[in-house]
Amino acid sequence: MRLNKRFGFMATLVLCAVMMAGSAAVAAEKVIKIGVLFPLTGTAAVAGQNCVNAVLAAADVINKKNPDIKAPLAAQEGILGGYKIVIVKADHQGKPDVAKSEAERLYNQEKVFAIIGCYNSSATKPASAVAERAKKIFMCGCSSSAALTERGYKYFFRHAPTDAIESEEFVQYIQYLNKEKKAGIKTLGVIYENTEFGKHAAEEAHKAASKAGLKIVADVPFNNGATNLNSEVQTLKAANPDAVFGAALGGDYSLWVRTMKQVGWLPKISLNYCTGYQNPAVQKELGRDGDYFMGGMGYSPALAKQFMPEAIKIEKKYYTPRSNQPFDSDSIQEGVMLFVLAQAIEKAGSLDTEKIVKILQTEEFPSAMSLSGNVKFNPGGQNAKALSVITQIKNQSYGTVFPLKYKAVEPVFPMTPWAKR
């Protein structure tokens, strides 16, 4: 009898263990792993961490009930009847070869459903090639090289305006200044990091300038992560262009600005691509030295207040507590891409990659964190609704100066010389 009782007790324990394991397995299955691949070390580490924090903020909106936020999926808890988004972080260090190997690891070992990344276009290119070969989804927020969406890829989708779009907008603004303000801008210099992003930005600058009749008098590449830009800035100073287009990320941007101060030179106007210019942390570091530079942006607190009120709610509730600053134009676009992917998964009703890709290719998605309010992808994955404005920074505040529809402040033109600041 004692043996039977003992056997029964052991059987009950085994049954409970099996049931608990089964329950744990079911619980584990209610998770969708999304990889985020950004530069978390190196010269662009601050920007990379901001991008991660924006994706985490979007995940919080999706995973939790947020009736106070009027954004897609915010009112429910999770997607597909309770699935939660789990973010898996990876660091590509700003190195293309590391981006490739980390993308392979995320897909093959971490078993992520999709990757969001990579900030640096030079890292996005090989990482997204890994995704394409594996027939896995790759969502890109802010990498701006136009070539990325000219590869005919099926599984790649990008939110940001390309360098081609921004170059054309920069030239349009110069033409406006020449016509309305008698600016007399006739010559252009281009300074850019010698990477996928920088080289393509420079190519698009040349194309746009040529169409507009602007003469390029200086073409100045530099190695990203440089510790000295004196030679490059002296080259610009010697050519003395009326305008400069800049493509410098993170710490490279602040080094460039400070070097111009050291040599005592400024152009009449400086317009910058999706670079360190957009990062509030970089501008805080520069202080008043950062004033009067301009650049393309898809987000600023002032723009959000007028055109993107729900983005401010998300920012205050989930982003600023992590980053101790507002969204910037780069980071917010990475968060957008998680929202878009989650909407596509919800519409598909399953984790069928091909079905989700078809939805991404054909449908339009409302986006509370996009200036245009919507996202729609063209063949190749470029967002047809991508929108950028030109801002000028003063006292660490971004004021919109162009297009006129969004204009909020009068530009300071020409740039105030260093000696008069």
What are these regions (language model features)?
Residues R2-A17, V26-R421:
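Extracytosolic ligand-binding ectodomains
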Residues G22-A24:
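N-terminal signal peptide c-region/cleavage motif recognized by signal peptidases
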